[in-house]
Amino acid sequence: MEVTDVRIRKVLDGGKMKAIVSVTLDDAFVVHDIKIVEGQNGLFVAMPSRRTPNGEFRDIAHPINASARARIQNAVLEAYEHRDAAEF
Protein backbone atom coordinates (compact mmCIF):
# COMPACT_ATOMS: atom_id res chain seq x y z
CA MET A 1 0.00 0.00 0.00
CA GLU A 2 1.36 3.37 -1.02
CA VAL A 3 0.07 6.82 -0.10
CA THR A 4 -0.14 8.46 -3.53
CA ASP A 5 -1.80 11.78 -2.67
CA VAL A 6 -2.46 13.90 0.42
CA ARG A 7 -4.84 16.87 0.24
CA ILE A 8 -4.95 19.24 3.20
CA ARG A 9 -7.61 21.77 4.24
CA LYS A 10 -6.37 23.88 7.13
CA VAL A 11 -8.75 24.69 9.98
CA LEU A 12 -8.33 28.32 11.01
CA ASP A 13 -10.47 28.51 14.16
CA GLY A 14 -7.50 28.41 16.56
CA GLY A 15 -8.60 25.15 18.19
CA LYS A 16 -6.77 21.86 18.59
CA MET A 17 -7.82 20.55 15.17
CA LYS A 18 -5.27 21.93 12.69
CA ALA A 19 -6.40 20.41 9.39
CA ILE A 20 -8.72 17.97 7.67
CA VAL A 21 -7.04 15.64 5.20
CA SER A 22 -7.95 13.33 2.33
CA VAL A 23 -5.50 10.51 1.61
CA THR A 24 -5.38 8.53 -1.64
CA LEU A 25 -3.97 5.00 -1.48
CA ASP A 26 -2.45 3.30 -4.55
CA ASP A 27 -4.17 5.84 -6.85
CA ALA A 28 -7.29 3.74 -6.27
CA PHE A 29 -8.94 4.46 -2.91
CA VAL A 30 -9.46 7.70 -0.97
CA VAL A 31 -10.15 8.23 2.72
CA HIS A 32 -11.67 11.63 3.59
CA ASP A 33 -11.99 13.46 6.92
CA ILE A 34 -8.71 12.37 8.50
CA LYS A 35 -7.84 14.99 11.13
CA ILE A 36 -4.54 16.50 12.22
CA VAL A 37 -4.88 17.36 15.91
CA GLU A 38 -2.57 19.14 18.35
CA GLY A 39 -2.23 16.87 21.38
CA GLN A 40 -0.21 17.06 24.59
CA ASN A 41 2.75 15.41 22.85
CA GLY A 42 2.51 17.25 19.53
CA LEU A 43 0.59 16.65 16.33
CA PHE A 44 -1.16 13.35 15.68
CA VAL A 45 -3.38 11.92 12.98
CA ALA A 46 -6.96 10.88 13.88
CA MET A 47 -8.85 8.58 11.53
CA PRO A 48 -12.38 9.52 10.42
CA SER A 49 -14.93 8.67 13.09
CA ARG A 50 -18.54 9.12 14.10
CA ARG A 51 -20.27 9.35 17.46
CA THR A 52 -22.34 6.34 18.48
CA PRO A 53 -25.73 6.76 20.20
CA ASN A 54 -24.05 6.18 23.60
CA GLY A 55 -21.56 9.01 23.00
CA GLU A 56 -18.46 7.00 22.09
CA PHE A 57 -16.46 7.74 18.94
CA ARG A 58 -15.83 4.83 16.55
CA ASP A 59 -13.46 4.90 13.59
CA ILE A 60 -15.17 4.63 10.22
CA ALA A 61 -11.96 3.56 8.47
CA HIS A 62 -8.58 2.79 9.98
CA PRO A 63 -5.35 0.90 9.29
CA ILE A 64 -5.33 -2.61 10.70
CA ASN A 65 -1.62 -2.79 11.52
CA ALA A 66 1.06 -0.49 12.90
CA SER A 67 3.03 -0.43 9.66
CA ALA A 68 0.10 0.89 7.62
CA ARG A 69 -0.76 3.42 10.32
CA ALA A 70 2.84 4.67 10.37
CA ARG A 71 2.95 5.07 6.56
CA ILE A 72 -0.28 7.07 6.54
CA GLN A 73 0.65 9.19 9.56
CA ASN A 74 4.14 9.95 8.22
CA ALA A 75 2.81 10.96 4.79
CA VAL A 76 0.09 13.17 6.30
CA LEU A 77 2.34 14.95 8.81
CA GLU A 78 5.12 15.42 6.24
CA ALA A 79 2.66 17.00 3.78
CA TYR A 80 1.21 19.20 6.54
CA GLU A 81 4.62 20.40 7.72
CA HIS A 82 5.80 20.98 4.14
CA ARG A 83 2.69 22.99 3.34
CA ASP A 84 2.94 24.91 6.62
CA ALA A 85 6.56 25.89 5.88
CA ALA A 86 5.63 26.97 2.35
CA GLU A 87 2.97 29.37 3.68
CA PHE A 88 5.49 31.50 5.60
Swiss-Prot record:
Domain of life of the native organism: Bacteria
Pfam families associated with the record: SpoVG
Matching InterPro entries: SpoVG (IPR007170), SpoVG_sf (IPR036751)
BP terms from Gene Ontology: division septum assembly; sporulation resulting in formation of a cellular spore
Keyword vocabulary terms for this entry: Cell cycle, Cell division, Septation
Family per similarity comment: Belongs to the SpoVG family.
Annotated function: Could be involved in septation.
HAMAP family: SpoVG
Protein name: Putative septation protein SpoVG
